Amino acid sequence: MSEPTSRRPAYARLLDRAVRILAVRDHSEQELRRKLSAPVMGKNGPEEIDATADDYERVIAWCHEHHYLDDERFVMRFIASRSRKGYGPARICQELNQKGISRESTEKAMRECEIDWSEMAHEQAVRKYGEPLPSNFSEKVKVQRFLLYRGYLMDDIQQIWRNFAD
């Protein structure tokens, strides 16, 4: 039988928790740090892991070393996931920034991903408003507002009507 969690060293408990968190999906380093430092629900309510800052650093280093934690991989998968859900580049960049990813890493990944954002914007507009897209001004404004909210850039949105006019 395994020993009770309260007797295990803090480092081992943190490492176990980190691996379980990263087994579900990729996380950024900042997200993992936040989740590791949050209290855990135990049998008797919330439990704090009495770990030192060094324990946290060792766990993060171990996760990097064993390729459980990789911000570059996280960014690429996050971009793919959010774009499949219909979000545009501006919204995705903002969400990555909130997750602690640097602007440089985000911009590099956005350049490397092979997503045609104007085509994605067109697909979202057609899904919401149907084919053919509205051509009168007031309806175009509604489509533009919707796509801006979803995180598409104005150039990509305007490209929809340029291609439509051709």
From Swiss-Prot:
GO terms for biological process: regulation of DNA repair. It is found in: Cytoplasm. It holds the Pfam family RecX_HTH1. GO terms for cellular component: cytoplasm. InterPro entries: RecX_HTH_1st, RecX_HTH_2nd, RecX_HTH_3rd, Regulatory_RecX, WH-like_DNA-bd_sf. The keyword Cytoplasm applies. Keywords: Cytoplasm. It comes from the Bacteria. Modulates RecA activity. Belongs to the RecX family. HAMAP family: RecX (MF_01114). This is Regulatory protein RecX. It comes from Salmonella heidelberg (strain SL476). The gene is recX.
